[in-house]
Amino acid sequence: MALRGSHRLEVIFKRCIASPVLHSHAANRRSSQLAIKEGDPNSNGNSGQYQQNGEQKEKGWRRLVRFFVPFSLGAVVSAAIIQREDLTPTIAASKMTGRRRDFNFIADVVAGCADSVVYIEIKDTRHFDYFSGQPITASNGSGFIIEQNGLILTNAHVVINKPHTMVQVRLSDGRTFPATIEDVDQTSDLATLRIQVNNLSVMRLGKSSTLRSGEWVVALGSPLALSNTVTAGVISSTQRASQELGLRNRDINYLQTDAAITFGNSGGPLVNLDGEAIGVNSMKVTAGISFAIPIDYVKVFLERAAEKRKKGSAYKTGYPVKRYMGITMLTLTPDILFELKSRSQNMPSNLTHGVLVWKVIVGSPAHSGGLQPGDIVTHINKKEIKNSSDVYDALADNSKTLDIVILRGVKQMHVTITPEDP
């Protein structure tokens, strides 16, 4: 459009250039003829004078044309550029609108399955809020609905080994219900809860065996008690053995992902792009390294739990309940140590083993004693701690208190904890 406009102006300018010349020649001819008809003796000389005047006028017109034409052409070019700049954002915006619609696959996944994700609160029945008079929240986690009649799947560490507490579940629509623990398997860190509600949105279960490294996944849950939180990433590994993570008595190949899984995400679903749960969010080591229990392993737990319920007994396996300290921990394997040292300059270079404290329950003995997430336990009661089994053994001792040596950054510190009896 701008080019057509510039072409029209060019034609007009050519006509303007030609018309002054024609006009001056016609004027000269008319003046010469008038002089001859009147019989002026100096008519020949006057006609030459008129011709000179015409030539001067012609030169003047040419000067004006030469002066105005560049400005006019510059205006045309500027108008074309401005018009093109005006059109460019419109075209880009239309393309971006289509791109947003075509590539917003994470939002499509969330829209299809977020209603089945729940927020789980563990209420301390011994301590009450000063203003509301309600039990305070000792810890929290996530879960997701697997049956319309109120059966919820979560991690065992979210709901058990917490004396003097009660469990509450908040749905995505804000409704809150008390929950009862039905099935527990501490070995696999899985548990089911029941709330007395029907016609709930159910999460579809996929197949973790078909996953590939690099596949997109979405983690749903309530990190740091922030309900309905969505993070996304890819599957980093489909076969991360529990032995690599220093987890005792667990024959599980975990799913490793770089999707952010923070405190409170535990028990929530790890979902594929078809909106199917392919894992249960379990733990985080550091930013970009988190783990989930494969859904194929979870299905075995659910089948056994259903058989037990048909027989009238709950499905409970795992270790005997020991004294309660209130932490979630992870053994520092060589691979994990290497990753931590590469991400943090505060890690001592001579550290070769220990246990990482990655969660501390508020109000627990560990919290009261001063343990913090990120601390590394190296000794308990003067015994070297190499893995999480050593911590369990220390809890099984008859010692009333635990004198714990920790590394916090580059500083070595001592804390004293008095575990609670079961």
From Swiss-Prot:
The active site annotation covers H157, D189, S266
Propeptide, residue positions: 18-74
Which post-translational modifications are recorded for this protein?
Answer: Ubiquitinated by th, thereby antagonizing induced cell death.
Enzyme Commission code(s) on record: 3.4.21.108
Q: Where is the transit peptide?
A: 1-17
Limits of the PDZ domain = 325-410
- What subcellular locations does the record give? Mitochondrion intermembrane space; Mitochondrion membrane
* One Pfam family cited in the UniProt record for this chain: Trypsin_2
* Catalytic activity from the UniProt record: Cleavage of non-polar aliphatic amino-acids at the P1 position, with a preference for Val, Ile and Met. At the P2 and P3 positions, Arg is selected most strongly with a secondary preference for other hydrophilic residues
GO cellular component terms, A-Z: cytosol; mitochondrial intermembrane space; mitochondrial membrane; mitochondrion; Nebenkern
Record has Cytoplasm as a keyword = no
Biased-composition ranges, Low complexity, are 42-54
Kindly state which keywords UniProt assigns to this record, in alphabetical order. Apoptosis, Hydrolase, Membrane, Mitochondrion, Protease, Serine protease, Transit peptide, Transmembrane, Transmembrane helix, Ubl conjugation, Zymogen
Q: What is this protein called?
A: Serine protease HTRA2, mitochondrial
Upper lineage: Eukaryota, Metazoa, Ecdysozoa, Arthropoda, Hexapoda
